[in-house]
Regions:
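Secretory/extracellular carbohydrate-interaction modules
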Residues: 1-47
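Surface-exposed loop/edge segments in extracytoplasmic proteins
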Residues: 32-34, 57-59, 91-97
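Short, aromatic/His-centered strand-loop micro-motif at the edge of beta-sheets
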Residues: 51-74
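Localized edge beta-strand/strand-to-loop motifs within extracellular or lumenal beta-rich domains
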Residues: 69-83, 88-90
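Short, solvent-exposed beta-strand-to-loop segments that form ligand-recognition rims
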Residues: 87-108
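Ligand-recognition surfaces built from glycine- and aromatic
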Residues: 101-138
Length: 138
């Protein structure tokens, strides 16, 4: 993911088992990455971002009203930061998280899905788009 670009992934949210998840994955190294998406945790879909730079943290907010709808996760890389935004259907993007990131780093990006507590999770991805970075960080 070059600097001054944005990546979006859109998928239908149909998660119903603990830790089902999908979204966007940005990788610098095995111990330095960002995972942004929706994870089914504690009985409800949670919009969240995990940031790992040797240690990890997770920010999350419940979005039960997103179940069964199209979710878009957007990562915009500009200057020394990545801005994570998300939306459901055609609603406006909402700011989720601002993550510092050295502009000299090479970043690989891709969609992801994960179901660590079961087999057989299927996620319907609708689009993968690269555009210009957002004008504002937040």
């Amino acid at each position: 993911m070059p600097s001054e670009t944005a990546i979006e992934v859109t998928f239908t949210l149909v998660f119903d088992e603990q830790f089902d998840q999908g979204g966007l994955f940005l990788r610098v190294a095995a111990d330095h990455w960002i995972k942004a998406g929706v994870e089914y945790a504690d009985g409800t879909p949670q919009l969240g971002v995990v940031v790992t730079d040797r240690l990890s943290d997770w920010s999350a907010a419940p979005v039960p009203e997103w179940q069964g709808r199209k979710v878009t996760i957007r990562a915009s890389r500009s200057g020394d930061a990545v801005t994570i935004r998300a939306r459901v259907d055609d609603e406006p993007f909402r700011f989720v998280r601002l993550v510092p990131l050295d502009p000299s780093l090479t970043v690989d990006a891709g969609p992801y899905l994960c179901a660590p507590t079961r087999s057989g999770l299927t996620v319907r991805f609708h689009s993968w788009i690269q555009t210009a970075a957002d004008d504002a960080l937040h």
